[in-house]
Amino acid sequence: MSSLINPTMRSCASLLSQVSVPSTRPASRTLGRAIRPLIIGGAAQTRYSSHSPMGAPPAVQRKKVTVGTLRSMHRKGDPITVMTAHDFPSGHVADHAGMDIILVGDSLAMVALGMEDTSEIILEEMLLHCRSVARATKSAFTVGDLPMGTYEISPDQALATAIRFIKEGRVQGVKLEGGKEMAPTIKKITTAGIPVLGHIGLTPQRQNALGGFRVQGKTSSGAMSILEDALALQEAGCFAMVVEAVPAEVAALITEKLSIPTIGIGAGNGTSGQVLVQVDMIGNFPPGRFLPKFVKKYGDVWGESLRAIEAYRDEVKSRQYPAPEHTYPISAEELENFTKAVKDS
């Protein structure tokens, strides 16, 4: 039907959609002053609410990162940056900061939902958080973590879960934990056209079988087992793989043997890229909280947030806030009419 529309009409309609129509309401009837102007199609528009999820777009919009982009970066030796996100704001800032991959990791079970470990989170919760992050992410490649219990039973179960992540979670790829035993499952998913990020070394969903959060590959045989896992996952079609809590030298040697990128977390500087949990590295929790050895804190969001909220509390208590500049005006005439109406009622 749209193909029958005259091109001139379509062009006119496009121009009309960008025209800002001035309000016909008298100034005295305006309920509030503009919070900020929006520029749409060159015309300034007025806003009376701050409840918009997006701020101004970046001055220079990045190209969308794809699997092809990541392969090209790997060939050039350009380190791949990966950051977790669990909601719209964390996805938004990670994307604006230029992350190549944003991972909606099941670590959100602990850092966003207050659960004891990653095994508690369920599929529907992960899908909800994936959708939130996906709405904020315009350039980075997004990956969703398949939660425990949604892919281990059979390759068919795993594929069904992966499809839901793409269709309902709106991410571009999925991540799952496990070594060579998961190769048939990964093959099933990648054959269906869904990119898979593998995860070897320390696999947190299996911490009970591993004896807790312990460094893996500290013996020759243990390191060889991880290499075998890596080669099997590569053969199954993974576009990259996370290598967690493995000695730096072991991770570097494994990286050299592979033709796909490795993303290290607690695996030294010889991998193809790095990933950190966002709330850990920006300092989202109070001092004294346990952090793994490999985490470097780049900020103090907890401290800044605490100072801001305490300042707000103090200003509300002292009636310093809201100040006149934070309130909306009413004309003297209308205020007089309203005051009279209140007295007469």
Q: Each PLM stretch: what is its role?
A:
Residues M1-K63:
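N-terminal mitochondrial targeting presequence
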Residues I40-A44, Y48-K296, G303-S345:
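Alpha/beta enzyme core
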